[in-house]
Amino acid sequence: LEQGYDTSCGMSVVATALDLYWGEPATETGIITATLGGAVDSGLYTVSLADMAAAFAAYGVAARAFKLDWEGLNAVVAKGYSPIVVHYERPERHFALLLGFKGGRAVTADPARGLESLSREAFETRYSGSAMALASKALSVDGALVDRAVAEAAGRHERLESAASRFALRAGR
């Protein structure tokens, strides 16, 4: 789901994870209202991982924050914990969902940029090292949807690379 406000990426990530991947109806505005106590009109929606964990808990999803590097994120995804909330520091503070890895690339659902396939270097340039794993006894993630999103982003990247290679070959003639 695309974030509706300049500073609402955290609540948009919560709504996307719940609504799209966990199948629990949720909206960004509803999460903001419930979590920030009616502050929808204030325009101030910047939140922390702790605020996001509280929002997830209200829907029966446990959230635990970790400091993880690239390998640690790969290990958590390999154990079936996907999507994972990731925090970016660059180019500005921001939250996204890490859906998985394919072909040495991280696939993210970014509330401002959409579905992305990022090289390790591009991901690590943005990533702060803070992530949050999610789990629930009552709800389950639509793993097939996560897998399709990862495959779609990876396929899009492969098609772009192929087109760029063909263009470079033609330009070199």
What feature does the model see in each segment?
Residues 34-136, 141-144:
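Conserved active-site-adjacent core of cysteine acyl-enzyme catalytic domains
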Residues 1-40, 158-160, 170-173:
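Active-site-adjacent structural segments surrounding the nucleophilic cysteine of cysteine proteases
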Residues 2, 24, 28, 71, ...:
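Glutamate identity and glutamate-enriched acidic tracts
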